Amino acid sequence: MKLVFGEGSCGIAAGARKVRAAVEKLNADGAVEVGITGCIGMCYLEPIVDVYGEPGTYPPSEASAEGGSMRGGNGEPLLARLVRVQEKDAERIYKAAASGDLSGVKDLEISADDKEFLEKQTRIALRHCGLIDPEDIAAYEAVDGSA
C-alpha cells in the first residue's frame, strides 16, 4: 500500500508533516510506500492521508475499471481518504497500511456527507489536485504542467 500525505500549505499548517514523520519513523523497514502531494483541495479536512492500493487492482466495491474510483498517478486505486489525522494516529495508520487491513482506521475516513459533496464537483483548474508531488518536477511535467 501507499500513503500519500497532503502537504499543501493548509496541510502543513494543520500538522501533516508531523504525522508523516511519525509514520516514516515506524516504517523503517520500508514496508509501506510513503509520499507527499500538494493541495488536495479540502482545507477544512486537513491533515489528509490518501491510502492507495497496488496499480491494476480495484477496491472491493469495484467490479471493473469502469467503477469510477479515484486513482493515483500510477493507476493505484484510492482505497481510503483519511481526514483530520493527528500525530497520535500515526501508529494505527502505519499498521493498517502495512497489514492491508483498513478496519482500524475507519473512524478517520472521510464522512459520507463530505464525500457526496466533493463527488459532485468537477475540477478543471485543479484536475490534478492531490496527485502531484510538489518536490518532483517530473510529476508536474507528466501531466503537461509545463505545456
What function would you assign to each model-found segment?
Residues 1-147:
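Feature of Fe-S/electron-transfer and energy-metabolism proteins
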